[in-house]
UniProtKB/Swiss-Prot annotation:
EC number: 6.2.1.54
Residues given in the record as ATP binding sites: 152-153, 294-299, 385, 397-400, 499
This protein's GO CC annotations: cytoplasm
Record-level GO BP terms: lipoteichoic acid biosynthetic process
Keywords: ATP-binding, Cytoplasm, Ligase, Nucleotide-binding
UniProt enzyme class: ligase
Annotated positions binding D-alanine: 199, 303, 499
InterPro entries: AA_adenyl_dom, AMP-bd_C, AMP-bd_C_sf, AMP-binding_CS, AMP-dep_synth/lig_dom, ANL_N_sf, DltA, DltA-like
Main location: cytoplasm
Family: Belongs to the ATP-dependent AMP-binding enzyme family. DltA subfamily.
Designated gene of the protein: dltA
Compartments where located: Cytoplasm
Organism: Streptococcus equi subsp. equi (strain 4047)
GO molecular function per UniProt: ATP binding; D-alanine [D-alanyl carrier protein] ligase activity
Name of the protein: D-alanine--D-alanyl carrier protein ligase
């Protein structure tokens, strides 16, 4: 059992100083180096006299210096806000505006100009490591202090910063390293694929650091080169794979992604989106002896609230795979619209309670009050997901209650996509609509668009209009949010209340 994340990392720095904590294509860093480097960076941070417990934004990819900076910030009592190098400039600015960080550590060059906040460059981080300054922890992150803050998308187009405390993190980490479903080995050798800005990353780094294992990362240049990416992954000595199911689907396009070629790979941990029967079946065909874990949970409940080991019998029995047994310390309920707990077999909203529930959204009391509450005397969160329990206390997923979806592993709010499209000077009104496949998984995003007067006459083809709209919004819209197909209409259907009838459009798209 882990009682303190930093003390555990420090323990391994003493017990196994030469054991690799990080490996990027053979470029290794040991636990001893992580302690030395994080101490040096912590000394630099402490010298800046930042506000007590103020959050710090860290911008970069899957590099070792990101990890060392996170550990350093925890040692100095600051929560870190991981922002991925592939983030759109407008999103970076929005996060900075909302979070008001006291410092920005730019492991990669920032895509925006910042004057009002001190920015520490990679060169300064390298200089700090070279100086090998001593550091003594006096006020590290503890208890209810924020450990990290991860930004998700918001319904108004504004991202929301989910505050995860040290206590939240320990609740998740101890469940994962002790639970029989995960069956995680000592010194796990984990693939570090999801970006640190995606809370699925916590599923690989937290148990790995808690058990003295190794993180296998890939350089940022490889992320967009899928052929090279997956051929490289097939050569890594990883034992545990953590990703969205969609990423595994892409990996299976490579014939070398199989048990024969990757005999060390024995565990698959999935979260972030629904694991379909077809993906699980294909994976068992490639890795017949593998342990496949289907986990479920929102960022607001610290990564996951339930998990289950998928069996071959389940694949033949269920049309939609179960999402697991709830964490023992996190009572999970199904409630009706009046807030009453329902019996097994009855479908309603999934709510989670207990020590893994976040304190809320950073600097956003209104959204916090909407989603977080108290249930049976415990902190609770409305997931917005439909679900039910079996008689054996297994949680079943029934889809989204609202128009928030999971697509390509990312949680996307359709209103967010629509709001971004409506910023185009070519668009009068637009609405994003998901198309589902037969396994209830979002297959792609479509956009229904009404053009501004005179726009259509400027283009020869609809394809050219689509290219122009995409070009006009690309600087403030994440690539994964961009619809793959645009449908042009003279007007959009309305509800009796005068709102765009999104349900009608969803039904139209999925029954063509």
């Amino acid at each position: 059992m882990v009682n303190d994340m930093i003390e555990t990392i420090e323990y391994f720095a003493q017990a196994q100083p030469d054991f690799p904590v990080y490996d990027c294509l053979g470029e290794r860093r040991s636990y001893g180096q992580l302690k030395e480097d994080s101490d040096s960076i912590a000394a630099l941070i402490e010298s800046l006299k930042l506000g007590e417990k103020s959050p710090v934004l860290v911008f970069g990819a899957q590099s070792y210096d990101m990890l060392a900076s996170f550990v350093a910030l925890t040692k100095t009592g600051h929560a870190y806000i991981p922002v991925d190098v592939h983030s759109a400039p407008e999103r970076v600015l929005s996060i900075i505006e909302i979070a008001q960080p006291s410092l920005i550590i730019a492991i990669e060059e920032l895509p925006v100009s910042i004057d009002a906040i001190r920015v520490v460059s990679l060169a300064e981080i390298e200089a700090a490591k070279a100086a090998k300054a001593a550091f003594t922890m006096t006020s590290p992150v503890k208890g209810d202090d924020n450990y990290y803050i991860i930004f998700t998308s918001g319904t108004t187009g504004q991202p929301k910063g989910v505050q995860i405390s040290h206590a939240n993190l320990l609740s998740f980490t101890n469940w994962m390293i002790e639970d029989a479903e995960f069956a995680i080995p000592e010194r796990p050798q984990m693939l570090a694929q999801p970006p640190y800005s995606f809370d699925l990353s916590v599923m690989y780094w937290a148990p790995t650091l808690a058990l003295g294992g190794t993180l296998f990362a890939l350089p940022k240049e490889m992320v967009s080169d899928f052929k090279r990416l997956f051929s490289t992954i097939a050569e890594l000595p990883i034992g545990i794979w953590t990703s969205t199911p969609s990423f595994a689907d892409m990996a299976m396009l490579n014939d070398d992604f199989c048990q024969e070629k990757m005999p060390r790979l024995t565990h698959f941990y999935f979260d972030g989106e629904e694991l379909t029967v077809s993906t699980a079946r294909k994976l068992f065909e490639r890795f017949p002896d593998a342990r496949i874990i289907n986990a479920y949970g929102p960022t607001e409940a610290t990564v996951a609230l339930s998990a289950i080991s998928i069996t071959k019998d389940m694949i033949e029995t269920y049309t939609r795979l179960p999402i697991g047994y709830p964490k023992p310390d996190s009572p999970t309920y199904i409630i009706d619209e009046a807030g009453n707990a329902l019996e097994p077999g009855q479908q309603g909203e999934i709510i989670v309670t207990g020590p893994a529930v976040s304190k809320g959204y950073l600097n956003n009391p209104e959204k916090t009050a909407e989603a977080f509450f108290t249930f049976n005397g415990m902190p609770a969160y409305h997931t917005g997901d439909l679900g039910s329990f079996t008689e054996d206390n297994v949680l079943l997923y029934g889809g989204r209650l609202d128009f928030q979806i999971k697509y390509a592993g990312y949680r996307i709010e359709l209103e967010d996509v629509s709001q971004q499209l409506n910023q185009s000077p070519l668009v009068e009104s637009a609405v994003a609509v998901p198309r589902y496949n037969k396994e209830h998984k979002v297959q792609n995003l479509l956009a229904y668009v009404v053009l501004k007067d005179g726009v259509r006459e400027q283009f020869a083809r609809d394809l050219d209009i689509t290219k122009a709209i995409k070009a006009s919004v690309k600087d403030h819209m994440m690539a994964y949010m961009m619809p793959s197909k645009f449908i042009y209409r003279e007007k959009l259907p309305l509800t009796p209340n005068g709102k765009i009838d999104i349900k009608f459009l969803i039904n139209e798209v999925n029954h063509q």
